[in-house]
């Protein structure tokens, strides 16, 4: 449990999360995949949480726009969702149970890329999980936008290898933040580890 860890150590842990959804409309669309990873403040992976495809009927998947239909078929998520027996409540409870082993409630910002969208979906479909996070976000896409404004050449070193599944997107986000830390850290006077 987190209580056994030194407070300083556990308070600096970061929870990375990614969702795949049927679309971007938070009122109409639904979460179909969730994954989490816990890192320390230096972005070293400490633990990989459960990765769930969330059960939805075929008619929900067929109602997705063309981009989502193609992407989720190509990644294999389409079939995983159809084969899954996991519901939102189960995925939420299991994810919280995993996080409780690593990070205290409210101690970590929500970390990832374009994380505000994930937070909106969690608020509606997994509210207990959304409340597990601190109200702040660590959004890697903010650094991407700043790099594009201030030093576009930094973006040349960003390599995405993801297959647009939740877990692979998390690892891409962590790698991207490592790249910005290395590239922008010296510019900002930060030590580069």
From Swiss-Prot:
GO molecular function: 3'-5'-RNA exonuclease activity; nucleic acid binding
Pfam families hit by this protein: RNase_T
Major localization class: cytoplasm
Class in the EC hierarchy, top level: hydrolase
Presence of the UniProt keyword Iron in the record: no
Domain Exonuclease: start-end pairs: 14-177
UniProt-listed Enzyme Commission number(s): 3.1.15.-
Superkingdom of the organism of origin: Bacteria
Name of the protein in question: Oligoribonuclease
GN (gene name): orn
């Amino acid at each position: 449990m987190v209580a056994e860890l030194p407070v300083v150590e556990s308070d600096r842990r970061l929870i990375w999360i990614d969702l795949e959804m049927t679309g971007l409309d938070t009122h109409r669309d639904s979460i179909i995949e969730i994954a989490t990873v816990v890192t320390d403040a230096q972005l070293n992976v400490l633990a990989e949480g459960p990765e769930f495809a969330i059960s939805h009927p075929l008619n929900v998947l067929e109602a997705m726009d063309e981009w989502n239909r193609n992407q989720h078929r190509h990644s294999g998520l389409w079939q995983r969702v159809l084969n899954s027996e996991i519901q939102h409540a189960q995925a939420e409870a299991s994810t919280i149970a995993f996080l409780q082993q690593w990070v205290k409630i409210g101690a970590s910002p929500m970390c990832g890329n374009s994380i505000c969208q994930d937070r909106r979906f969690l608020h509606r479909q997994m509210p207990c999980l959304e409340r597990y996070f601190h109200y702040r976000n660590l959004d890697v896409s903010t650094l991407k936008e700043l790099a594009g404004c201030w030093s576009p050449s930094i973006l040349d070193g960003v390599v995405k290898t993801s297959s647009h599944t939740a877990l692979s997107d998390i690892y891409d986000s962590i790698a991207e933040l490592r790249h910005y830390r290395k590239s922008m850290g010296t510019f900002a006077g930060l030590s580069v580890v």
